[in-house]
UniProtKB/Swiss-Prot annotation:
Domain of life (superkingdom): Archaea
Lineage of source species: Archaea, Methanobacteriati, Methanobacteriota, Stenosarchaea group, Halobacteria
Gene3D superfamilies (alphabetical): 6.10.140.50, Spore Coat Polysaccharide Biosynthesis Protein SpsA, Chain A (3.90.550.10)
UniProt xrefs under PANTHER family: 2-PHOSPHO-L-LACTATE GUANYLYLTRANSFERASE
GO biological process: F420-0 metabolic process
Organism: Haloferax volcanii (strain ATCC 29605 / DSM 3757 / JCM 8879 / NBRC 14742 / NCIMB 2012 / VKM B-1768 / DS2)
Name of the protein: 2-phospho-L-lactate guanylyltransferase
Subunit structure: Homodimer.
Catalytic activity: (2S)-2-phospholactate + GTP + H(+) = (2S)-lactyl-2-diphospho-5'-guanosine + diphosphate
Purpose: Guanylyltransferase that catalyzes the activation of (2S)-2-phospholactate (2-PL) as (2S)-lactyl-2-diphospho-5'-guanosine, via the condensation of 2-PL with GTP. It is involved in the biosynthesis of coenzyme F420, a hydride carrier cofactor.
UniProt pathway annotation: Cofactor biosynthesis; coenzyme F420 biosynthesis
C-alpha cells in the first residue's frame, strides 16, 4: 500500500519550545518520522514523505509547502494504483500491529482519530472522498464520507491516537515508546517526574 507521511520540518513542534530549542525540536521530529517509516515498512507499506522543507530519511521525499489539506488532497487525486494511506509523522507510539489494524480494516475510508478531534491516519479506497484537516477533522471526515456515499470505519487505537505536540505528550512517549523517539528523549535528559498528581515530563540539563 502506498503510504503518504506528511512532515512539517521547517519549524517543527513549536509547542515543545519550553523543553527544546529549534535544532533539538527538528532532531526530535525527525526521530519520530523515522519511527513511523520503520513501522510502515514493517507491515509491507511503501512510505513516501511529503515535507515543507527538505529532510534526509530512508524514504522518497517530496518538498511541498502547501497546507496539509491541499497536500493530502493532491496525493488522493489518483487512486488508480490502489488504496492510499496517510499517516502523520508525529505518531511516535505507532507500531506495526496498530498500523496493520488500520490497513486491514475493510471500508472505503478508514480513520484513526487523534486525541482532541484530529485525524491521525487514514486509508482511502474511494475516489469521491476528500480531506479537510482544519479543526476537529475527524468530524469533517465522517461527514465527507457520508456525503460521498463511502463506507467509513474508525480504528480505536491509543498508539495511533497520540500525536506528539505538547509537553504532556512526552510522558506517553517515555511510558509507551519503543523506538528512536524515546531514545532521543532519554539521551536529551527528559525523564518522568512522579509527584502527588499526574506524572509529568521534566528535563535535566546536561
Amino acid at each position: 500500500m502506498r503510504v503518504v507521511v506528511p512532515f512539517g520540518g521547517r519549524d517543527p513542534k513549536t509547542r515543545l519550545a519550553p523543553f527544546f530549542d529549534a535544532d533539538e525540536r527538528r532532531e526530535f521530529a525527525v526521530s519520530m518520522l523515522r519511527d513511523v517509516l520503520d513501522a510502515v515498512r514493517a507491515v509491507g507499506g511503501d512510505p513516501a514523505v511529503v515535507a515543507d522543507a527538505l529532510v534526509t530519511v530512508d524514504a522518497p521525499v517530496t518538498v511541498d509547502d502547501r497546507p496539509l489539506t491541499e497536500v493530502v488532497g493532491g496525493e488522493l487525486d489518483d487512486l488508480g494504483g490502489g488504496p492510499v494511506a496517510v499517516v502523520m509523522a508525529d505518531l511516535a507510539l505507532a507500531t506495526p500491529a496498530a498500523l496493520s489494524r488500520l490497513f486491514e480494516t475493510d471500508a472505503d475510508v478508514v480513520a484513526a482519530p487523534g486525541l482532541g478531534g484530529g485525524t491521525n491516519a487514514l486509508v482511502v479506497r474511494h475516489p469521491e472522498f476528500s480531506v479537510d484537516y482544519h479543526g476537529a477533522s475527524i468530524l469533517d471526515h465522517r461527514r465527507i464520507a457520508r456525503d460521498a456515499g463511502c463506507s467509513f470505519a474508525e480504528v480505536d487505537s491509543m498508539r495511533l491516537a497520540v500525536d506528539v505536540d505538547e509537553p504532556s505528550d512526552l510522558v506517553e512517549v517515555l511510558v509507551h515508546g519503543e523506538g528512536r523517539a524515546r531514545e532521543w528523549l532519554v539521551d536529551a535528559g527528559v525523564r518522568l517526574a512522579r509527584g502527588s498528581g499526574r506524572v509529568e515530563a521534566v528535563r535535566e540539563r546536561r
